[in-house]
A protein has these predicted regions:
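Macromolecular interaction modules
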Residues: 1-108
Length: 108
């Protein structure tokens, strides 16, 4: 069974320092408290592009679940919706992109 995940892609914020403070001090702790059933959480900061231009996105969050069923149950909960609303509230560069996916991994 493939792992399922929610991927949240945040656009570059209007104020990077204010976003970073809200993300680290408010949002991540809130998400960890409210979003139940995750098997793994990965936060990524986008630091550049291959051509050196400013990237249009600033952060990517990946919330892993053991199955699509577990993800769907979690996503339907009021506590998860509270965390999602907070993600949108702190995203000053525009609404974040939220995707549901199944991970396919190849190991070398």
């Amino acid at each position: 069974m493939a792992e399922a995940k929610i991927v949240v892609i945040y656009p570059r914020p209007t104020d990077v320092d204010a976003f970073e403070k809200a993300y680290v001090e408010e949002h991540v702790p809130l998400a960890m408290e409210k979003i139940k059933g995750m098997s793994k959480f990965a936060a990524t900061k986008v630091v550049g592009t291959p051509d050196g231009s400013t990237p249009p996105f600033y952060r990517i969050a990946e919330l892993y679940f053991p199955s699509m069923e577990a993800l769907q149950q979690c996503a339907a909960s009021a506590s998860t919706q509270e965390a999602v609303a907070h993600a949108f509230a702190i995203s000053t560069g525009g609404p974040p992109i939220v995707l549901v996916s199944e991970e396919e991994t190849t190991k070398f």
